[in-house]
Amino acid sequence: IAYEKIIHQFDEVFTISKFEQNYTKEKFNKGKFIPVFHGNKEFQLLSEKGKFALYHGDLRTSDNRKVVSFLIDVFKEIDYPFVIASSTREDWVKSKIQNFKHIKFIKLKDFDHLKDLFENAHINISWSFQESGTKLKIINALFNSRFSIINKNVIDDKLISNLCIKVSDKSELIKAINKFKNQPFIASDEYVNTLEYYLNNQLNAEKILKQIFS
């Protein structure tokens, strides 16, 4: 990788995933972890119950399409509304869900549209079949919605993953959805503090500035 040839010239390397931090520490003896930056300022306090489970993503990527196929297969076995939201591949999704009245595709317009979906979702599902660090979509769901169910590939930051419901396969995912679909969501003080302090954009930017100018 081209940039690795000049890393030795840098005083420090900032990383936004634990995987990257471990890699740069091991290979270059540099690497300071800073949580991913995002556009959220504060946790949105919503009612305790939403109306559906939500998956959103860019369906131009093969991994996300594989996830959608997997989740459709999951919700064939669950009597609960499921919304797939994306700005792409509408016809492809609709061809897969045409026989399932409780599964719906919504074409995303913009982030405000996504926030409206977050506001009404009771369960957010983030899944990947490949290791990907911490996905921004999870941060957005945690700030703006209710329950988040994940598998291990979408978060490598323990503090953030502790805010989510972690499962590893189809069977565990079905059990989790059935368990939480009727359970009220009540955010603990620890939940809110992790979002508003640990993931605070301004505080994390100040950490970078302090490192640069100290």
Where are the language model's segments positioned?
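Membrane-proximal helix-turn-helix segments that form the acceptor-binding/catalytic region
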Residues: 1-13
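Short acidic alpha-helix that forms the nucleotide-activated donor recognition element
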Residues: 5-8, 110-122, 143
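Acidic donor-binding loop of glycosyltransferase active sites
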Residues: 11, 118-133, 146-147
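A charged, aromatic-enriched C-terminal amphipathic alpha-helix characteristic of glycosyltransferases
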Residues: 44, 182-214
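Short glycine/proline-enriched, acidic/aromatic patches that form the donor-sugar handling elements
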Residues: 114-115, 131-133, 153-162
